[in-house]
Amino acid sequence: MENVSTPAVFNLSDLSVEMNSSSRQWSYSEYSEAVAVLLGILMALLVMCIVFGNVLVITAIVRFQRLQTVTNMFITSLACADLVMGLLVVPFGACYILLNTWHFGSFLCEFWTAADVLCVTASIETLCVIALDRYLAITSPLRYPSLLTKRKACVVVVTVWGVAALISFLPIHMKWWVSDEPEALSCLEDAHCCDFNTNAAYAVASSVVSFYIPLAVMAFVYGRVFQEARKQLEKIRGSEGRFHAQMIDNNQGQDGGDGSGGGGGNGKRPKFCLKEHKALKTLGIIMGTFTLCWLPFFVLNVVVTIWKVDNIKMPFRILNWIGYANSAFNPLIYCRSPEFRYAFQEILCLRGAAFPTNGYIYRGHSLRLSPKDKPGSLSNNVGTVELGSLSSVTNINGYCNNPPLASIV
């Protein structure tokens, strides 16, 4: 970067940069040895959890056909963003903190910073897409399979990553973020400094575009999804009540217990419908966890541009790493899904070849009736059963016709 200052200022600036660079090069840690070791262990564990968990999620979706649904394509995109965070962003960030200096050059510094912004932006945009996907599934259940096919989902995923890359890499490569503060300019000239000292305009604009606008869209759409889900649940309960009352009236003049069989079938209907609402809760946990992890950082990122606050480096660092930790949480949340749990167990060889559940045996890519079930005992009521599948839903006697809300049930 060219310096347009006067010669005297130029010399002082060069001297300052040289001294700062020398001090950074030889000052390997700002923490004591014990604290540095503890931080290193914690950061290494976080990296391993992020990488292991998200590789497990991606492997499960790729390997098991029943997990290869439209919404799970978006889940794969989210896992890829978390995986990049664990492989690239977090390890370099850990080295920078522990060594208190940057050893990887200016190009990797910019690339690392842009990758950080890329992963966060791609994650929240993907969560927005998932919310829109669920809104279409619950409001237009019959048209949903044609509205969002796997091919269209691929286009959406590529678009999300393209927009995220444009938002992250272009401004950083063009140096639109550089602050005119002396400390920021000094760091920019120092090959051993990789602090992201942004100007106020970039800090506000990037926070709004990369976080606040997608967050508002996600919250609004997901609120509408919950409203629609509540309406459907009320309709289902009303239908169940009328059906139960009709069965009682029909059985009053009959001898024997013919109505008991109907009651048993009636008791099964809400389970499939409640399963969809459990899927909504799971998606809500994913979105809520992401918001709780990253919202404090982005609030502080905007606040410090309005009010100058001293000694803000440590709070920034803590909140930033809370955001990083979010990448390790999603695989744990997916364990709410029976199919994901079974897939994880099979990948990790934690169970036998067959795992019976609810009268079904889950073998690789197929679900089969277990021997204890009578032939045809479920075939009369159940069309195609996909535990937690996104692409279709079991329909029992006309109830709960909309497609399931997520495979992460």
UniProtKB/Swiss-Prot annotation:
GO cellular component: membrane; plasma membrane
Residue intervals passing through the bilayer: 38-61, 75-98, 110-132, 154-177, 200-223, 283-306, 319-337
Disulfide bonds: C109-C194, C187-C193
Pfam families attached to this UniProt entry: 7tm_1 (PF00001)
Tissue expr: Highly expressed in the liver and red and white muscle, with lower levels of expression in the gills, heart, kidney and spleen.
A GO biological process held by the record: adrenergic receptor signaling pathway
Subcellular location: Cell membrane
Parts forming coiled coils: none
Molecular functions (GO terms): beta2-adrenergic receptor activity; norepinephrine binding
Record-linked SMART domains: 7TM_GPCR_Srsx
Cytoplasmic face of the membrane: 62-74, 133-153, 224-282, 338-409
The family this protein is said to belong to: Belongs to the G-protein coupled receptor 1 family. Adrenergic receptor subfamily. ADRB2 sub-subfamily.
Protein name, per record: Beta-2 adrenergic receptor
Species this protein is from: Oncorhynchus mykiss (Rainbow trout)
